Amino acid sequence: MASGDESKRRLTILGSTGSIGTNTLDVVERLGGRNRFEIAALTGNGNIPLLADQARRMGAELAVTADEHRYGELKDALGGSGIEVAAGRSGLIEAAERDAGWLMAAIVGNAGLGPTLAAARRGADIALANKECLVSAGSLFIEAVAKGGGRLLPVDSEHNAIFQVLENDQRHAVERIILTASGGPFRTKSLEEMRHVTADIARAHPNWSMGLKISIDSASMFNKALEMIEARHLFRLRPDQIEVIVHPQSVIHSMVGYSDGSVLAQLGCPDMRTAIGYALTYPKRCDLPIERLDFAKLARLDFEAPDEARFPALRLARRAMQAGGIQGAVLNGAKETALEAFIKGRIGFLAMAEIVEKVMDRLSDLPAAVTMDDVFAADEKARLTAAGLIQ
């Protein structure tokens, strides 16, 4: 475990201006702000005014923009504050390596891999919201966390739920885990209807408030596909132990089934601050003004099997897990390229999964990753191959 004064935790937030990052700071302030947390570093990308405001408000020691061209703008925005400023990939690594016992890894995409890995190697306790660390880097990242000696605390609501109900002394008795999925905005849509949806329609999630890309990933169920791969690495599971069930109310966040037939579930209103608060204050629980479940008003919980004909991302995740090696990075890289093309209106909604499958077919013989350079190389090949299919 990372060292530090438990009465005031030193925290770095990678990706503080995004959806997870802003909610993390909301939780930090609700838990006492600067009286309970020391903010070692905050990082963002293009939203310089918000990053500067966050850094000043929280008394951060260091503020970093991932965009090297915005360094001067950030420095000017923080003039006279005494807050250090850095930019680019080296700045992100500097933030991750700064002495802080706790780190929120909320940078979206491969840009978060390097700095999160750096934090793992130095032994930080990591609240993990970046999917690529596990989907693309998998065993390499888990190995780095183990060698560093820190803890890995999942922030995804589904994995956080499993983490909460998984009995460490009973891991040998785990039979399966069941990831719940809302089904997204197209749960009841036909294939023909799904052919004509736009990014604006796909971003409208029925239960959760999220950013554009993750909302569309939820609509296509690629988000759930990535969570399946993450769960395999986080909880050391076989692919056949991971199930997905559609649960439209998003009240049960995930379940663990044991060999005696028992199933333990974590329930709560759909609010990402619950998982964030749990990860930031672990092993203690914190007081948060989250809406409480009223079971009398809830009345019912619904479940249905996912339709993999309409949502083939789940099938592709199983294929990637069974193949092992570098296929998680291939799936993710191809998905990211297809997602960008869909957002720009260059391909249809259903074409995203079709492109990912074709890329996996073409790159099925890539060797397993030995280093992070192998991961980045596979990701680049997948993106280039997908781009070629889109043209």
From Swiss-Prot:
Q: Which InterPro entries match?
A: DXP_reductoisomerase, DXP_reductoisomerase_C, DXP_reductoisomerase_N, DXPR_C, DXPR_C_sf, NAD(P)-bd_dom_sf
**SUPFAM superfamilies, alphabetized:** 1-deoxy-D-xylulose-5-phosphate reductoisomerase, C-terminal domain, Glyceraldehyde-3-phosphate dehydrogenase-like, C-terminal domain, NAD(P)-binding Rossmann-fold domains
Q: Which UniProt keywords apply?
A: Isoprene biosynthesis, Manganese, Metal-binding, NADP, Oxidoreductase
One GO MF annotation is: NADPH binding
Q: What class of enzyme is it?
A: oxidoreductase
Keyword Manganese among UniProt keywords:
yes
Give the residue spans that cross the bilayer: none
- Listed pathway(s): Isoprenoid biosynthesis; isopentenyl diphosphate biosynthesis via DXP pathway; isopentenyl diphosphate from 1-deoxy-D-xylulose 5-phosphate: step 1/6
**Pfam families given in the database record:** DXP_redisom_C, DXP_reductoisom, DXPR_C
Q: Which reaction does it catalyse?
A: 2-C-methyl-D-erythritol 4-phosphate + NADP(+) = 1-deoxy-D-xylulose 5-phosphate + NADPH + H(+)
Residue positions annotated to bind Mn(2+) are D156, E158, E227
- Reply yes or no: does the keyword NADP apply: yes
Q: Which GO terms describe its biological process?
A: isopentenyl diphosphate biosynthetic process, methylerythritol 4-phosphate pathway involved in terpenoid biosynthetic process
- UniProt: NADPH binding residues: T17, G18, S19, I20, N47, N130, E132, G211
As recorded in UniProt, its EC number(s) are: 1.1.1.267
Q: What biological function has been recorded for the protein in this entry?
A: Catalyzes the NADPH-dependent rearrangement and reduction of 1-deoxy-D-xylulose-5-phosphate (DXP) to 2-C-methyl-D-erythritol 4-phosphate (MEP).
Family indicated by similarity: Belongs to the DXR family.
Q: What is the name of the protein in this document? A: 1-deoxy-D-xylulose 5-phosphate reductoisomerase
Name of the coding gene: dxr
